């Protein structure tokens, strides 16, 4: 997702199949990924349906900005987390790795043709799987833009050097993005600060150092 923060834009980019006869279908062995999953995978969408009759799939991105999906030439399709779990760490069980031959945006989704898949029935077996791509395969962010995944986990301090907490998420309220910053109260209870991700409060964002400096008081 792209959001406007006065020049700073954080980019957001987290079932058993059966045939008509009731027999379980198995994915082609060539699609199964048996090695260790890359450690920089980021969940960016899910397979909503097969598209057409030639093995294309339709993916619903998790964010308005689908640039990561369109830029990456290899996707990992992993089983959805258990019911009630919104997202979960990538698990290698029955992981599918596909090379993308073609992809394009289509009515708020991304449609793609996996290499080696030319049959709609195989594409249908991928429905419901979460789509992960490597962070290394994201397109480079433009000046003043940041991917949300790079902001989460950053320490937040103010100009006085006082620790404000750690970024645990972001909210898009339509006008701008808001950092969700978790911290601990003196009595040990967890609390949260909501800091607008706009130039009025931002001083520096150093993602390699995992540090964000803001104009924000401890008592705000």
Curated annotation (Swiss-Prot):
Report if keyword Iron is assigned: no
User: Ranges for the PRC barrel domain?
Assistant: 143-220
Query: Which superkingdom is the protein from?
Result: Bacteria
The entry's free-text remark on domains says: The PRC barrel domain binds ribosomal protein uS19.
- Cited function: An accessory protein needed during the final step in the assembly of 30S ribosomal subunit, possibly for assembly of the head region. Essential for efficient processing of 16S rRNA. May be needed both before and after RbfA during the maturation of 16S rRNA. It has affinity for free ribosomal 30S subunits but not for 70S ribosomes.
Print the organism lineage: Bacteria, Pseudomonadati, Pseudomonadota, Betaproteobacteria, Burkholderiales
Which Gene3D superfamilies does this chain map to? PRC-barrel domain (2.30.30.240), RimM (2.40.30.60)
List keywords of the entry alphabetically. Chaperone, Cytoplasm, Ribosome biogenesis, rRNA processing
> Which Pfam families did the record assign?
PRC_RimM, RimM
Q: How does it assemble?
A: Binds ribosomal protein uS19.
The protein's matches in InterPro entries, at most eight in alphabetical order, are given as: PRC_barrel-like_sf (IPR011033), PRC_RimM (IPR056792), RimM (IPR011961), RimM_N (IPR002676), RimM_N_sf (IPR036976), Transl_B-barrel_sf (IPR009000)
Name the UniProt record assigns to this protein: Ribosome maturation factor RimM
Q: Which family does it belong to?
A: Belongs to the RimM family.
Organism of derivation: Cupriavidus metallidurans (strain ATCC 43123 / DSM 2839 / NBRC 102507 / CH34)
Its subcellular locations are: Cytoplasm
One of the record's GO cellular component terms: ribosome
GN (gene name): rimM
What processes in GO biological process is this protein linked to? ribosomal small subunit biogenesis; rRNA processing
Question: SUPFAM superfamilies, per this entry?
Answer: PRC-barrel domain, Translation proteins
Q: Give GO MF terms, alphabetically.
A: ribosome binding
């Amino acid at each position: 997702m792209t959001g406007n923060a006065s020049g700073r834009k954080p980019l957001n980019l987290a079932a058993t199949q059966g045939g008509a006869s009731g027999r379980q279908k198995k994915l082609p062995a060539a699609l199964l990924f048996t090695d260790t999953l890359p450690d920089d995978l980021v969940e960016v969408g899910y397979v909503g349906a097969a598209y057409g009759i030639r093995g294309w799939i339709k993916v619903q991105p998790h964010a308005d900005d689908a640039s990561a999906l369109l830029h990456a030439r290899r996707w990992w399709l992993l089983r959805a987390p258990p019911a009630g779990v919104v997202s979960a760490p990538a698990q290698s069980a029955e992981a599918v790795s596909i090379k993308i031959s073609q992809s394009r945006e289509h009515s708020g989704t991304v449609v793609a043709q996996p290499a080696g898949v030319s049959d709609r029935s195989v594409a249908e077996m991928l429905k419901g799987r979460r789509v992960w791509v490597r962070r290394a395969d994201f397109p480079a962010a433009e000046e003043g833009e940041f991917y949300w995944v790079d902001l989460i986990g950053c320490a937040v301090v103010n100009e006085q050097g006082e620790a404000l907490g750690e970024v645990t998420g972001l909210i898009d309220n339509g006008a701008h993005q808001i950092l969700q910053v978790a911290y601990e109260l003196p009595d040990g209870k967890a609390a949260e600060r909501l800091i607008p991700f706009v130039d009025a409060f931002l001083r520096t964002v150093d993602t390699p150092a995992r540090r964000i400096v803001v104009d924000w008081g401890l008592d705000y």
